[in-house]
């Protein structure tokens, strides 16, 4: 079952983490590469963020992977999909080279643009417009989203936090899970796998108006280091569970269209024609399928149970997403920091706006980091932060009396990524209002 002689991106990540003297030093180094880390005890979640250039193989694994730090090293608990790129997005040479070392066949696309790089069969998988939730085993079945270790984030609907709902994604998932599946489903799951679901729900709508809540299995991956971090087809695992349960459990799956590749169509980048061609086929697979759907993921198996994915979003979806998302300075800062602007940035004017935004953010972070380093060094010469942390913190606070953005400095001192991001959102919003909306 497992793929042989494959070194997965998460193994590159482990190798990189092991090169540092401590998790704290590793996290700090990754942060400078645009990889954010959320920490709960000995658990670490790695998620790419603003500024990640995706020029290292281990960057691909940082899409919500959760690892545990042990005395003997790092253990993978959950490993969702590797990073997959938007159609037409340029890939860094190291990433292209990595995929080419795994490929069955020669590359189709010589310009390093995300798309069908390989002359291999492909399938188009329905891209659901929901929330990715991963189920993994750690002394019991637990879940996380791609941005939260415990899935305790607030529900977002139409791009806005639904403050009227006293629920988290974790509560919404288990509530939906209990409605859709029998509780004994968990007994049929493989504890050496993590299960990647897409949760769609009227109360967590983005664009597509799903009328009924649902949980759809979109991916399965081994987290057994001895066998390898290979993927298992969702339909394959669904059939196994269906058979083992005597036909009592029927996992929901996304619509999948398998077809021979049309390289002329894709090389010409005529995506509108592609959607005109495949939308009726998808509608035939899913009864009552909406014409306006998010799009699809094009999947190619480039080595045994190793997949290369490209996401292609429906033009109408992109336009509706633009309309649904109120682009206030605060919302723009939020989308930018969450690395989600690629969902709707299309026009040259918008591309120019993003470039300005990057300049504003880079300037802001450089100023903050420079000030932090200066203050930290200055106070460290007076009192040791290790030997007398209380006095150090007191002097640190006094030194910040005249600073507008004290919360960022304390979050940076404590290594609290979530508070840093919250503070950065506030600061970036202020700078956007001055720099882009004046």
From Swiss-Prot:
Gene Ontology MF terms in the entry: ATP binding; ligase activity; metal ion binding
Key words of the record: ATP-binding, Evasion of bacteria-mediated translation shutoff by virus, Host-virus interaction, Ligase, Magnesium, Manganese, Metal-binding, Nucleotide-binding, RNA repair
Summary of the function given for this chain in its UniProt record: Involved in countering a host defense mechanism which, following viral infection, activates the host induced anticodon nuclease and shuts off viral translation. Repairs 5'-PO4 and 3'-OH groups in the cleaved host tRNA.
Catalytic site positions: 127 (n6-amp-lysine intermediate)
Protein name, as recorded: RNA ligase
pH curve summary: Optimum pH is 7.
Pfam family, one: RNA_lig_T4_1
Catalytic EC class: ligase
